[in-house]
C-alpha cells in the first residue's frame, strides 16, 4: 500500500489512466497519449490494477448501457475467472459483454471520467458476487475511511487527486453481492463527483447505496467513467486488517445514510461547482481538501461550534457539509448529531443546575477556552462591574431571602437526584468566604457560579453551547440573581481563588485548584449543603421569619468574617478552618456545621474534624482548633486521644464544666448555621492577636535554651510529646483549661523574659479562649527557625507566618493521627528508641519540641500523667496510625522550609546526641510552675519521669547513627524470623530458592540461568492466564484478569527506602575504603602483616573451593547455625568461652616474645 505515493497518484481523467496490467478475459484499450504516464506508474501500481479493474469489469452492463463510448478506454482486468489466460498488454479490441455481471469496456469511459469514482465504487462492493472476492477480504464497514485515509495534499478543483492505495476505504469493495440496479447510482455518482475538489472517497457516500440508487437510476445518460479510483479500491479489497479498523464506525455511517438521504444524494447531483465547494469549506472552518485522516476530527471540532448550537442551522450545515465534502461530511455529520445527542442530557442538567443555582450564563458563553482560572474571574468582573448599579441593597436582601427559601424547598423536593446532578456539573452550594476590598462576605450562592465557570473551563465547548440555548429572560434573571447574591462584589464568584492568588500563590496554585474542582465534583459528600439550608429553614420555619432567618444567618457569617478576612490575608491564613476552606472550597462549612453539635462545649473548636477525608488536595486538617469533646461520631483515634486528655483534666473539668455546658446548652438549641456563624466568630478572635508574634520574635534570643531542653525531654520521655501537643491543640475546647494554659505559658515565659511577655499575656487572658490556639501557632515559629537556622529570625514576619500556618496545619494532623502511638511509646521504649531519625515517628518526636519549646515546657510535664493512664489502651490504635504519619510529616517538612530541609534533617539526625548535653536548668523551673498550676500530684510524677527517662537518652546518644540503625532495626525482625525459621514456609521458600539459584550457577552460566528462570516463570503465568480465561469463558463469569491484584499493587521502591539502604551501604563502603587504605599503605605494620597472613590463607581456600561453593556453604551456614545455636546455646557458649580463653593465652605468649606485638597490645 503506497501511502507515501500520493503525489504520483494525482491524476485527471485525461492524463493518468491506469497502465494495462495483464488482462485475463477482456481486451482493453488505453489512451495513446497517456502510455508514458502509465509506464511511470507501472512499477508502483501493478498489483492495484489487478484488483481495481476487476471491480469495474464486474459491474453489470445494464446500468451503464447509455454511457457514451470514449475515444480511448482505460484497460480493465478481471480476476474473477482464473481459467482465462492473461491477454497481452497494450491497446486491445473491446471485448463483447458476454457475462451480465461483467461490464464491457465500450460501456465505460474510464479515462474521461472523474477520479472521484470511489463513491460509486463504494456502492458496488455491496453488490459484487461474494464468490469472486478473495477469501481473505471481510466486508469492510465504510465508517472509518476519513479517519484512516492517508493524508493527501490538497488539490485544486480542476485536478482532483486520486486516493492512495493505502486508504482504508478500498476494502469497502469486499462487501457482499447485491442486486444489479445499483449500478446506475454508482455511475451517476461517478459523473457528479468528477469535479469535486476533495476526491478522497467519502466513506459516508460509500455507505449510501440505497439512497443513491433512487437518484441515480433516473438519469438517462452517464458521463465518462474512470477506473482510477476503482483501481485502488479493488486493490485494497484484500486488506482485511484495514477492514477491521472500520468496524466500529459502520453503524454511525449507516445511521447517517438513513437520516440524511436527500441531503447526501441531491447535493452530489445538483452541485458541481468546485469554487462554490471550496468557499463552503472555508465557511465551515475546515479544509476538506486536506488530509482525509484529519478531516473528520477537524470537522467535528469546527462544526460542533456551528452545528450543535443552532438546530435550524444544523440542517443547512449538514447539507453544505455533505454537499461540498463528499468524503467527510456523512461520517462527521453523524458524529455531530451523535455528539449533540450525547450533550443534550448534559445541557439539560446544566440548565437545571443553572436554574437552581442561579448562575450567570453569559460568563460561560465567553469563557470557552482553557485558560487559568483567573481569566474566568476577570470575565466575571467585566460582567459584574457593569451591573453593580442594577440592584439596590434592599432589593438584594429581599430577593436573596426569597431565593434562599426557594432554593431550600427546591433542594428538599429534588432530594438525592438533584444532589447527584449537582455533583456532576458543579459543587454543592456552600457558604464561602469572599473578600471585597475591606469587606468580607460569606455567600451561599456565589460559589455555584464560580464552580460553573470552572466547569466551563473544563468543558469549554459544551458549556458554550448549552448557554446559548437559554432565553434572554433567563439570562437576565440569572445575572440579576448572581449580582444580588454576590452583593455587587466582582470577586465573590470564587473568593478562594482570589484569596489564594492574593496571598498564597505558593501554597495552592491554579493547577491544584483544577484538580480540586474535578475531584470534588466526583467525590463531594451528598446533601451537606442542602441539609444546611434545609435545616436552617426548617428550624426557623415555625416562626414568622422563616426565610429571613436563613438569610440573616448568612449575613451573620458575612459580618463576622470581615475582620477574619482582614487578618487572614496579611497573616497568610493562620486560621486553619478558613485555610482549609480555600484549599477545599465545598466541604469546609458543611463539616463545620455537622461537627458543631458534637463539639458544642466550645463552638469554636469543631472546625474541621472530618476535613482530611473530604479534602481533595489531601491537605491534613489542623487539630489545633478541634475540640476535645468525646463523641461516638468522632474517629476512634480522635476519641481515644480526647479520652486521654479528658482523663488528665478530670479535676480541671469539674471547675470548667459549668461554663462550658452553659455554652453547650445555648449552642445545641441553635440551628447548624448559627453554630457555624459562632464558630467563625470565635475563629475571628483567634486570628486577631498578631502582635504576639512580634512578642515571640523579641524573646527569640531567650528561647535557644528552651527548645534544646524540650528536645531533651522528648528524647527522654517520648510520650510527653503528643500529650503536650494535644494539650495546646485540643484543651482550648475548655475555657478554663485554656486560661490555665495561658497562665502556664505566661509563667514559663516570665522565667525567661518577664518584662517582654507580661503585657502580651494580659491581652491573651482577656481574649477569647479560642485565642490560645493562635498564639500557639505563632509561638511555634521562632523556635522552629531558631533551631533550624539562627539567620532565619531575620526573615520578615509575614513570610514566617505563611509558612507556619501551612506547616502547622499539616503538622497538627500528623500529631492527630499519631497521638495514640506517641502517647503509648513508654511501654515500647526500647522499640521506639531504636527508631532512627528518618522514621516518621522520630520526626514527630523531634518536631513537636520545636513547636512547644517556648510555652509548652510546663505542659508537657503536666500531661505526663495523661499518657501514663492511656498508654496501655492506646498501643494498638497508635501502632495502626503509624503509616498515616508519614505523609503529613513529609508534607510539613517539604512545604514549610524547603530551603532548609537538608539542614533540618541533619538537625533531627543529630538531635538525640546533641540535646542530651544541654543542662537541665529549665526542666526544674517548668516542673515547679506546673506544680503551682496543676497541683501537688504532678510535680513528683514529672520529676520522677524526668529522672527515669533522662538516662536512656544519655546512653543512646552514642548509638544513634543517621539511618543505619533504623534500617537494621526495621528489618531485624523479618531477617531474624527468616534465619530462625519462625515461619517455616516462608523460610523454606527463601532458602530453597536461593540454594537452587546457587546450585544452578555451578552448572550453567548466569545468562543461561537467568533465561531459564524467565522462561519458567513465563510458562507458568501464561498457562495460568489462559486457563483462567477458558474457565471464565465456560462459566460465563467476568472475574477479569487473574493477576489484576498484583498488577495494581504498588511495587515502586520508595525514595526513603533507597536513601536508607544507600546511606547504610555508604557508611560501610567508606569505612572499608579507609581500612584498606590504612592496611595497604602500612599505617600499622602489625595490622598489615595480619592482613597479609589472611590473604595467604585465602589462597589455599580458593584452591580448595570455588567462589560459588563458598557462597553455597555460607548460605547453608546462615540458615542452620542460628537455629543450632538457639537450641544449644549453653553448650556452645561454654565451648566458645574455652576457645576464646585458649586463643587469648596463646596470643599473650606470642606477644610476650615479640616486642612489637607486645607494645601494640599495651
Curated annotation (Swiss-Prot):
| N-acetylmethionine PTM sites in chain numbering | 1
The record, for InterPro entries, names: Reticulon, RTN1-4
**Location of the Reticulon domain:** 975-1162
Q: Where is the composition biased (Acidic residues)?
A: 31-54, 713-730
Stretch list, region Disordered: 1-183, 408-432, 711-730
Return the protein name.
Reticulon-4
Question: What domain of life does the UniProt record list for this protein's source?
Answer: Eukaryota
Q: Does the keyword Acetylation apply?
A: yes
Q: Does the keyword Thylakoid apply?
A: no
Q: Pfam families this protein is in?
A: Reticulon
Where is the signal peptide, in residue numbers? none
User: Which GO biological process categories is it annotated with?
Assistant: axonal fasciculation; blastocyst formation; cardiac epithelial to mesenchymal transition; cell adhesion involved in sprouting angiogenesis; cell migration involved in vasculogenesis; cellular response to hypoxia; central nervous system vasculogenesis; cerebral cortex radial glia-guided migration
Q: Please give the residue positions where the record annotates the modification Phosphothreonine.
A: 348, 430, 834
Spans through the membrane: 989-1009, 1079-1099
Key words, A-Z: Acetylation, Cell junction, Cell membrane, Endoplasmic reticulum, Membrane, Neurogenesis, Phosphoprotein, Synapse, Transmembrane, Transmembrane helix
As stated in the Swiss-Prot or TrEMBL entry, residues carrying the post-translational modification Phosphoserine are: 7, 16, 105, 145, 165, 167, 329, 344, 426, 489, 690, 727, 768, 832, 857, 961
Q: Which residues, renumbered to this chain, carry the PTM N6-acetyllysine?
A: 1074
Q: How does it assemble?
A: Binds to RTN4R. Interacts with ATL1. Interacts with TMEM170A. Interacts with RTN4IP1.
Gene inactivation phenotype reads:
Isoform A mutant embryos show defects in the development of fore- and hindlimb innervation. Increased fasciculation and decreased branching of nerves innervating fore- and hindlimbs seen. Disturbances of the radial migration pattern of neuronal precursor cells seen in embryonic cortex. Isoform A mutants show increased density of blood vessels in postnatal brain, which is lost in adult brain. Knockout mice for isoforms A and B are markedly hypotensive compared to control mice, with no significant increase of heart rate. They have mesenteric arteries thinner than controls.
GO cellular component terms given for this protein: anchoring junction; axon; cell junction; cell projection; dendritic growth cone; endoplasmic reticulum; endoplasmic reticulum membrane; endoplasmic reticulum tubular network membrane
Q: Which gene encodes it?
A: Rtn4
Q: Compositional bias (Low complexity) spans? A: 7-16, 109-127
Tell me the residue ranges located in the Cytoplasmic compartment per UniProt: 1-988, 1100-1162
Amino acid at each position: 500500500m503506497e501511502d507515501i505515493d500520493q503525489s504520483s497518484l494525482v491524476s485527471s481523467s485525461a492524463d493518468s489512466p491506469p497502465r494495462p496490467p495483464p488482462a485475463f478475459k477482456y481486451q482493453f484499450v488505453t489512451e495513446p497519449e497517456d502510455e508514458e504516464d502509465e509506464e511511470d506508474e507501472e512499477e508502483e501500481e501493478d498489483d492495484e490494477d489487478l484488483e481495481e479493474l476487476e471491480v469495474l469489469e464486474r459491474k453489470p452492463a445494464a446500468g451503464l448501457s447509455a454511457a457514451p463510448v470514449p475515444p480511448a478506454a482505460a484497460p480493465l482486468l478481471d480476476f474473477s475467472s482464473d481459467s482465462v489466460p492473461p491477454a497481452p498488454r497494450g491497446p486491445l479490441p473491446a471485448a463483447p459483454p458476454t457475462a451480465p455481471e461483467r461490464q464491457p469496456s465500450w460501456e465505460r469511459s474510464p479515462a474521461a471520467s472523474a477520479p472521484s469514482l470511489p463513491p460509486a465504487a463504494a456502492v458496488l462492493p455491496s453488490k459484487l458476487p461474494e464468490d469472486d472476492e478473495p477469501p481473505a477480504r471481510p466486508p469492510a464497514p465504510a465508517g472509518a475511511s476519513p479517519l484512516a485515509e492517508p493524508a493527501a495534499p490538497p488539490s485544486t478543483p480542476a485536478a482532483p487527486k486520486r486516493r492512495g492505495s493505502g486508504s482504508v476505504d478500498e476494502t469497502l469493495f469486499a462487501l457482499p453481492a447485491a442486486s444489479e440496479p445499483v449500478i446506475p447510482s454508482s455511475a451517476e455518482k461517478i459523473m457528479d463527483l468528477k469535479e469535486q475538489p476533495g476526491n478522497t472517497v467519502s466513506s459516508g457516500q460509500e455507505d449510501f447505496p440505497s439512497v443513491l440508487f433512487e437518484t441515480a437510476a433516473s438519469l438517462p445518460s452517464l458521463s465518462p467513467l474512470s477506473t482510477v479510483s476503482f483501481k485502488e479500491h479493488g486493490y485494497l479489497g484484500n486488506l482485511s486488517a484495514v477492514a477491521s479498523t472500520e468496524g466500529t464506525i459502520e453503524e454511525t455511517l449507516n445511521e447517517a445514510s438513513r437520516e440524511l438521504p436527500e441531503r447526501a444524494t441531491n447535493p452530489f447531483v445538483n452541485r458541481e461547482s468546485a469554487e462554490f465547494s471550496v468557499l463552503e469549506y472555508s465557511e465551515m472552518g475546515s479544509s476538506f481538501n486536506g488530509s482525509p485522516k484529519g478531516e473528520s476530527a477537524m470537522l467535528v471540532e469546527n462544526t460542533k461550534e456551528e452545528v450543535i448550537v443552532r438546530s435550524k442551522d444544523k440542517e443547512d450545515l449538514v447539507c453544505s457539509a455533505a454537499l461540498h465534502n463528499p468524503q467527510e461530511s456523512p461520517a462527521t455529520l453523524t458524529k455531530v448529531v451523535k455528539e449533540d445527542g450525547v450533550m443534550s442530557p448534559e445541557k439539560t442538567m446544566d440548565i437545571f443546575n443553572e436554574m437552581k443555582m442561579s448562575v450567570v450564563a453569559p460568563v460561560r458563553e465567553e469563557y470557552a477556552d482553557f485558560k487559568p482560572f483567573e481569566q474566568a474571574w476577570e470575565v466575571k468582573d467585566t460582567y459584574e462591574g457593569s451591573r453593580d448599579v442594577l440592584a439596590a441593597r434592599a432589593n438584594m436582601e429581599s430577593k436573596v431571602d426569597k431565593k434562599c427559601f426557594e432554593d431550600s424547598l427546591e433542594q428538599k423536593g429534588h432530594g438525592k437526584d438533584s444532589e447527584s446532578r449537582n455533583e456532576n456539573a458543579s459543587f454543592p452550594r456552600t457558604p464561602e468566604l469572599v473578600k471585597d476590598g475591606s469587606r468580607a462576605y460569606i455567600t451561599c450562592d456565589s460559589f455555584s457560579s464560580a464552580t460553573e465557570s470552572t466547569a466551563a473551563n473544563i468543558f469549554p465547548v459544551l458549556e458554550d453551547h448549552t448557554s446559548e440555548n437559554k432565553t434572554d429572560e433567563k439570562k437576565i434573571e440569572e445575572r440579576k440573581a448572581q449580582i444580588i447574591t454576590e452583593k455587587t462584589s466582582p470577586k465573590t464568584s470564587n473568593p478562594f481563588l482570589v484569596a489564594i492568588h492574593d496571598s498564597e500563590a505558593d501554597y495552592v496554585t491554579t493547577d491544584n485548584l483544577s484538580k480540586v474542582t474535578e475531584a470534588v465534583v466526583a467525590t463531594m459528600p451528598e446533601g451537606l449543603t442542602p441539609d444546611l439550608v434545609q435545616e436552617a429553614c426548617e428550624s426557623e420555619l415555625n416562626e414568622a421569619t422563616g426565610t429571613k432567618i436563613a438569610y440573616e444567618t448568612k449575613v451573620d457569617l458575612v459580618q463576622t468574617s470581615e475582620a477574619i478576612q482582614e487578618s487572614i490575608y496579611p497573616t497568610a491564613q493562620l486560621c486553619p478552618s478558613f485555610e482549609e476552606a480555600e484549599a477545599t472550597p465545598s466541604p469546609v462549612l458543611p463539616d463545620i456545621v455537622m461537627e458543631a453539635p458534637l463539639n458544642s462545649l466550645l463552638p469554636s473548636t469543631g472546625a474541621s474534624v472530618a476535613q482530611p477525608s473530604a479534602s481533595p488536595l489531601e491537605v491534613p486538617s489542623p487539630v489545633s482548633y478541634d475540640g476535645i469533646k468525646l463523641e461516638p461520631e468522632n474517629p476512634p483515634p480522635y476519641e481515644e486521644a480526647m479520652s486521654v486528655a479528658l482523663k488528665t483534666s478530670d479535676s480541671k473539668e469539674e471547675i470548667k464544666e459549668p461554663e462550658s455546658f452553659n455554652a453547650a446548652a445555648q449552642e445545641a438549641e441553635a440551628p447548624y448555621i448559627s453554630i457555624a456563624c459562632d464558630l467563625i466568630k470565635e475563629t475571628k478572635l483567634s486570628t486577631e492577636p498578631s502582635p504576639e508574634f512580634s512578642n515571640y520574635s523579641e524573646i527569640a534570643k531567650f528561647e535557644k535554651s528552651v527548645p534544646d531542653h524540650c528536645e531533651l525531654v522528648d528524647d527522654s520521655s517520648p510520650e510527653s510529646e503528643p500529650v503536650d501537643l494535644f494539650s495546646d491543640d485540643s484543651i482550648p475546647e475548655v475555657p478554663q483549661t485554656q486560661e490555665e494554659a495561658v497562665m502556664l505559658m505566661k509563667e514559663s515565659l516570665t522565667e525567661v523574659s518577664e518584662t517582654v511577655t507580661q503585657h502580651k499575656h494580659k491581652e491573651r487572658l482577656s481574649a477569647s479562649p479560642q485565642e490560645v490556639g493562635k498564639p500557639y501557632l505563632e509561638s511555634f515559629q521562632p523556635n522552629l527557625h531558631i533551631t533550624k537556622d539562627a539567620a532565619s529570625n531575620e526573615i520578615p514576619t509575614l513570610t514566617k507566618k505563611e509558612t507556619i500556618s501551612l506547616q502547622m496545619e499539616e503538622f497538627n494532623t500528623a500529631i492527630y493521627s499519631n497521638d495514640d502511638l506517641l502517647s503509648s511509646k513508654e511501654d515500647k521504649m526500647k522499640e521506639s528508641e531504636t527508631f532512627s531519625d528518618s522514621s516518621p515517628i522520630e520526626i514527630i518526636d523531634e518536631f513537636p519540641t520545636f513547636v512547644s519549646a517556648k510555652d509548652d515546657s510546663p505542659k508537657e510535664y503536666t500531661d505526663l500523667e495523661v499518657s501514663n493512664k492511656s498508654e496501655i489502651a492506646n498501643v494498638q490504635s497508635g501502632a495502626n496510625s503509624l503509616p498515616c504519619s508519614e505523609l503529613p510529616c513529609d508534607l510539613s517538612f517539604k512545604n514549610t522550609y524547603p530551603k532548609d530541609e537538608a539542614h533540618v534533617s541533619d538537625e533531627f539526625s543529630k538531635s538525640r546526641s546533641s540535646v542530651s548535653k544541654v543542662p537541665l536548668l529549665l526542666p526544674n523551673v517548668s516542673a515547679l510552675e506546673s506544680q503551682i498550676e496543676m497541683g501537688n500530684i504532678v510535680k513528683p510524677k514529672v520529676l520522677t519521669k524526668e529522672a527515669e527517662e533522662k538516662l536512656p537518652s544519655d546512653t543512646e546518644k552514642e548509638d544513634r547513627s543517621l539511618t543505619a540503625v533504623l534500617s537494621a532495626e526495621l528489618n531485624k525482625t523479618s531477617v531474624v524470623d527468616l534465619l530462625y525459621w519462625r515461619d517455616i514456609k516462608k523460610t523454606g521458600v527463601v532458602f530453597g530458592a536461593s540454594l537452587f539459584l546457587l546450585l544452578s550457577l555451578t552448572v550453567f552460566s548466569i545468562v543461561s540461568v537467568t533465561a531459564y528462570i524467565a522462561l519458567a516463570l513465563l510458562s507458568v503465568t501464561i498457562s495460568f492466564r489462559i486457563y483462567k480465561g477458558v474457565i471464565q469463558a465456560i462459566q460465563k463469569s467476568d472475574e477479569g484478569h487473574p493477576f489484576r491484584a498484583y498488577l495494581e499493587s504498588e511495587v515502586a521502591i520508595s525514595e526513603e527506602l533507597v536513601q536508607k539502604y544507600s546511606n547504610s551501604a555508604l557508611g560501610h563502603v567508606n569505612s572499608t575504603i579507609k581500612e584498606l587504605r590504612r592496611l595497604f599503605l602500612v599505617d600499622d605494620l602489625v595490622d598489615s602483616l595480619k592482613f597479609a597472613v589472611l590473604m595467604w590463607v585465602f589462597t589455599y581456600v580458593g584452591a580448595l573451593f570455588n567462589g560459588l561453593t563458598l557462597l553455597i556453604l555460607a548460605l547453608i551456614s546462615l540458615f542452620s547455625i542460628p537455629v543450632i545455636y538457639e537450641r544449644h546455646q549453653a553448650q556452645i557458649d561454654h565451648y566458645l568461652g574455652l576457645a576464646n580463653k585458649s586463643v587469648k593465652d596463646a596470643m599473650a605468649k606470642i606477644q610476650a616474645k615479640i616486642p612489637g606485638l607486645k607494645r601494640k597490645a599495651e
